[in-house]
């Protein structure tokens, strides 16, 4: 095996997460947007492996989370579908356990998890992945279709890759560079078998139905109008889509209609703003009005039901300024 020049020593860090903002902060350099979509206090764990040539992570959360965004690095993300994450919707589609999800750097990470989900992922540099799969690189990384793909390897190949990935995430800290390279190479070798065994090109499933474009466009409008009034008819008029069709697509993808999704986006952003404003002069009322919440009593009840605490508690004040 060719020796790799080390820019940084390999490392592994484990985190216990007691707040959704901890989760958001941990992955903020990735550049995605995160929303807690189920009700209750958030808790979870995360393991981040920064290796010699690859990266890996494991995230376990008790609440459902919607994630949308694009990694800024030129990395290919590979995620095994297991019993712990098979109820996750990947780009609007559920995959059965035994599949391998592959997402190239040009493709958005776009998924909706359920409660108590565990996701493990291996991130491989694009040039390295391209060398591994050869002429299949274009379709596997989504550069031809701008969508993720799923492939179903043999059961034995999949188990070996999962074991190698778990071994990588269970490495002791500090990680010895030579042992790290050995574990990484084993993981890459097992991944290569998963990707290339048999008629690989015939086992590839592209993810991303036409309805995904409509969801993307709708979410973009919501983000643009996040601090302004927005009605369902505004979205339908701009996208020239029937309200019933839009509601059905959102129900299938998120379990709720578009306007409930929009309100949840604003609720999550409000919580982020309240956390950021701790120790300052801003009040709950000021921040709530910024995101269009005018009935503060109703907001307090909805907020507590969703996050398990009052807005004033998130802001860090002993006595509420609006709910009393």
Protein language model features and the residues they cover:
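N-terminal low-complexity or simple alpha-helical regulatory segments
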Residues: 1-74, 79
């Amino acid at each position: 095996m060719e020796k790799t020049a080390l820019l940084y020593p390999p490392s592994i860090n484990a985190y216990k997460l007691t707040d959704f903002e901890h989760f958001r902060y941990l992955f903020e350099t990735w550049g995605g947007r995160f929303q807690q979509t189920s009700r209750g206090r958030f808790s979870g764990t995360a393991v981040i492996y920064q290796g010699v040539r690859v990266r890996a992570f494991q995230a376990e959360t008790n609440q459902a989370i919607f994630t949308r965004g694009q990694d800024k690095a030129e990395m290919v993300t590979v995620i095994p579908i297991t019993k712990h994450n098979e109820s996750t919707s990947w780009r609007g589609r559920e995959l059965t356990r035994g599949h391998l999800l592959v997402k190239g750097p040009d493709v958005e990470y776009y998924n909706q998890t359920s409660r108590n989900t565990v996701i493990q992922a291996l991130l491989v540099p694009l040039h390295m992945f391209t060398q591994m799969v050869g002429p299949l690189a274009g379709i596997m990384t989504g550069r031809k279709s701008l969508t993720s793909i799923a492939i179903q390897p043999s059961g034995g190949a999949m188990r070996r890759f999962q074991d190698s990935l778990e071994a990588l995430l269970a490495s002791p800290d500090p990680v010895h560079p030579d042992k790290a390279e050995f574990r990484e190479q084993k993981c890459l070798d097992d991944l290569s078998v998963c990707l290339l065994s048999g008629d690989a090109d015939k086992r590839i499933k592209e993810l991303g139905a036409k309805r995904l474009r409509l969801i993307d466009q709708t979410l973009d409008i919501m983000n643009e109008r996040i601090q302004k009034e927005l009605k369902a008819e505004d979205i339908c008029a701009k996208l020239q889509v029937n309200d019933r069709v839009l509601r059905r697509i959102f129900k299938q993808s998120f379990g709720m209609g578009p306007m409930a999704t929009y309100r949840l986006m604003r609720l999550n952003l409000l919580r982020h703003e309240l956390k950021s404003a701790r120790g300052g002069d801003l009040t709950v009322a000021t921040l709530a009005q910024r995101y269009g919440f005018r009935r503060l009593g109703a907001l307090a009840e909805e907020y507590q039901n969703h996050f398990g605490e009052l807005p004033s508690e998130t802001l860090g004040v002993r006595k509420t300024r609006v709910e009393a």
